[in-house]
Amino acid sequence: MEALHQKIREQGIVLSDQVLKVDAFLNHQIDPALMKLIGDEFATLFKDSGITKIVTIEASGIAPAIMTGLNLGVPVIFARKQQSLTLTENLLSATVYSFTKKTESTVAISPRHLTSSDRVLIIDDFLANGKASQALISIIKQAGATVAGLGIVIEKSFQGGRAELDSQGYRVESLARVKSLKDGVVTFIE
């Protein structure tokens, strides 16, 4: 997606050969016009997949997930990292390791919002080692629902997440596939 590539080139900051900072438009400050384009693109890619729900993890996946949900006309569920007093029932949950935060947390979704008849699209801001995606897949399977695909805003293709998801047979659509962050330069897979 050229608009996303351009935004990454202009405002992304390479912190190391493993870390790309995009807080100017995606995961701290949000560019609504770009999120609309991202939602449009994911909706086009998955329009014929029978999606009934979108699932993401709070917080950075919420903006692209909402815009995709708006386009597809389906609800968006975000897995919570912190248990709320309002989440009182037995939760669907999984443990996830954050590559950038170097921490492990439990994410959870209420079983009231996900059923065995749902076809779920996972939307996330980044795909690195695939741990967040695997946690969401686990939660969706606990509900007996079907994973219809994954929409990733930025994929770090040099890490193993995509290969693992591909080997499990999941459809993965990434809007920006980063080949390398070497020497402070973002190189895309075109």
Curated annotation (Swiss-Prot):
Fill in the subunit field for this protein: Homodimer.
For this record, the Gene Ontology CC terms, alphabetical, are: cytoplasm
The protein's gene is named xpt
TM region positions:
none
A GO MF annotation of the entry reads: xanthine phosphoribosyltransferase activity
Enzyme Commission no: 2.4.2.22
Name where it's found: Cytoplasm
The keyword Nucleus belongs to this UniProt entry's keyword annotation: no
What is the scientific name of the source organism? Pseudomonas fluorescens (strain Pf0-1)
Q: Primary place of residence?
A: cytoplasm
Q: Cite the Gene3D superfamilies for this sequence.
A: 3.40.50.2020
Going by the record, the broad EC class of this enzyme is: transferase
Name by which UniProt lists this protein:
Xanthine phosphoribosyltransferase
The entry's xanthine-binding residues are: L20, N27, K156
One GO BP annotation is: XMP salvage
Q: Which pathway is this protein engaged in? A: Purine metabolism; XMP biosynthesis via salvage pathway; XMP from xanthine: step 1/1
Q: List the keywords (alphabetical).
A: Cytoplasm, Glycosyltransferase, Purine salvage, Transferase
The job of this chain, per UniProt, is described as: Converts the preformed base xanthine, a product of nucleic acid breakdown, to xanthosine 5'-monophosphate (XMP), so it can be reused for RNA or DNA synthesis.
Q: What catalytic reaction does the record list?
A: XMP + diphosphate = xanthine + 5-phospho-alpha-D-ribose 1-diphosphate
List positions binding 5-phospho-alpha-D-ribose 1-diphosphate: A128, N129, G130, K131, A132
